[in-house]
Amino acid sequence: MAASIGALKSSPSSNNCINERRNDSTRAVSSRNLSFSSSHLAGDKLMPVSSLRSQGVRFNVRRSPMIVSPKAVSDSQNSQTCLDPDASRSVLGIILGGGAGTRLYPLTKKRAKPAVPLGANYRLIDIPVSNCLNSNISKIYVLTQFNSASLNRHLSRAYASNMGGYKNEGFVEVLAAQQSPENPDWFQGTADAVRQYLWLFEEHTVLEYLILAGDHLYRMDYEKFIQAHRETDADITVAALPMDEKRATAFGLMKIDEEGRIIEFAEKPQGEQLQAMKVDTTILGLDDKRAKEMPFIASMGIYVISKDVMLNLLRDKFPGANDFGSEVIPGATSLGMRVQAYLYDGYWEDIGTIEAFYNANLGITKKPVPDFSFYDRSAPIYTQPRYLPPSKMLDADVTDSVIGEGCVIKNCKIHHSVVGLRSCISEGAIIEDSLLMGADYYETDADRKLLAAKGSVPIGIGKNCHIKRAIIDKNARIGDNVKIINKDNVQEAARETDGYFIKSGIVTVIKDALIPSGIII
């Protein structure tokens, strides 16, 4: 069953961190400047690092030329991060909902990209939000522009309004694009979206902004990311992936010096330019063997930016810049700011295309270890509690598959597939290598009889259907004896009036579509 946000509690390790901070009498900076949680300090403000520096305050931190990768640290059960001040009070999470999602169309026809269903029970937005909550970051904004109704509804139902406890300091809130006298245009890019809401973000008494994408699949401890940012005294820290030469041409690459400081950027380089972007990734924590296999580092589009630096860059230095990755971050480097790389050496997938989305979902069925696991008790993925009954399987043959809650599966075969919430699959059906997103609601027996009397089709998969290498969006009505197998091996096709698209050879049936009985696709 998907984890509910109501179950989120402080871990013993986080309490230990708090106790250590309270008992630490050797800190260079007094608690009056950095903490406002104690009752006798109520009303004190968290001072930006730049302000403290200007007052002559020295930070007792060690600058290290090596940034240890999350793979080497966060995978250890004994590793512990003690941020001071802690992330819940000093970091604001900003999740970018993305653009129109044209490459994910038709899945984004009626929903924002972060609202696309994932892994039977979840939505894409649950990934960055859960990573934040598991990293003790409870102040989270989600910026959206397109089709945000279902995303808004999901977030309001999934994440309680009082996540910060009795002080009510935590929240997950959607900020939709809006027009104003100061900003008459819609969001023009990632940086512009953040700029248009700077007036709101700067009201929060924090040290850093954590900028995240809403369409990535990965599990990351952001506290270690933020700790590296502070330890290296960085203005900006960029999460980076190690890359081999084959994949590197599809990403924005970075070059670093011996301290892990970013000195050069290249967007999807080829040939000699690609070879020039090779770096010694042992600097970031890879062993010699992995470093030879992965001589490039690519930006993940995830940033920690100090608050005063963000305000300065977006308002003063680059008031017309629209994008973080191609304009603001390289611009900060050119200004001489300290822009650090932080290596993330775990599973990460950009869910930007139908093929990537399909592979990411089917990857959770992989044996013996899935590409991404929803079963990690130390860092669960939260979502909306739906209170559905257990799935019912009647004489069904199910292998290497993931089945969501509330499904009714009758005398059929399902292999290497993901079956979403409330899916109804009738007798004789064969489902292979496919993703079924399920339904938003159940139809009553009376509804189904009425549809049958009218010659229409109920929600779900009809009798004796064969579905292979396909995505069936929510509330689709697939009649009896339908074959969705891409019999002609078509790679690209737009058949919206017929209820489906084909992209990269994957048939995608549109949400609420009707595929009549006997149709062969």
UniProtKB/Swiss-Prot annotation:
Gene Ontology MF annotations: ATP binding; glucose-1-phosphate adenylyltransferase activity
EC number: 2.7.7.27
GO cellular component, one term: amyloplast
Entry keyword Oxidoreductase: no
Localization per Swiss-Prot or TrEMBL: Plastid, Chloroplast; Plastid, Amyloplast
Protein's GO biological process: glycogen biosynthetic process; starch biosynthetic process
Organelle transit peptide: 1-72
Record carries keyword Ribonucleoprotein: no
Pfam families found in the cross-reference section: LbH_GLGC, NTP_transferase
Activity regulation note: Activated by 3'phosphoglycerate, inhibited by orthophosphate. Allosteric regulation.
PROSITE patterns according to UniProt: ADP_GLC_PYROPHOSPH_1 (PS00808), ADP_GLC_PYROPHOSPH_2 (PS00809), ADP_GLC_PYROPHOSPH_3 (PS00810)
Superkingdom in the source lineage: Eukaryota
Tissue: Leaves and tubers.
Binding site for substrate: 268
Sorted UniProt keywords: Allosteric enzyme, Amyloplast, ATP-binding, Chloroplast, Nucleotide-binding, Nucleotidyltransferase, Plastid, Starch biosynthesis, Transferase, Transit peptide
Pathway per the UniProt entry: Glycan biosynthesis; starch biosynthesis
PANTHER family: GLUCOSE-1-PHOSPHATE ADENYLYLTRANSFERASE LARGE SUBUNIT 1, CHLOROPLASTIC-RELATED, GLUCOSE-1-PHOSPHATE ADENYLYLTRANSFERASE-RELATED
Known function: This protein plays a role in synthesis of starch. It catalyzes the synthesis of the activated glycosyl donor, ADP-glucose from Glc-1-P and ATP.
Subunit structure comment from the entry: Heterotetramer.
Name of this chain's protein: Glucose-1-phosphate adenylyltransferase small subunit, chloroplastic/amyloplastic
Native species: Solanum tuberosum
Native organism taxonomy: Eukaryota, Viridiplantae, Streptophyta, Embryophyta, Tracheophyta
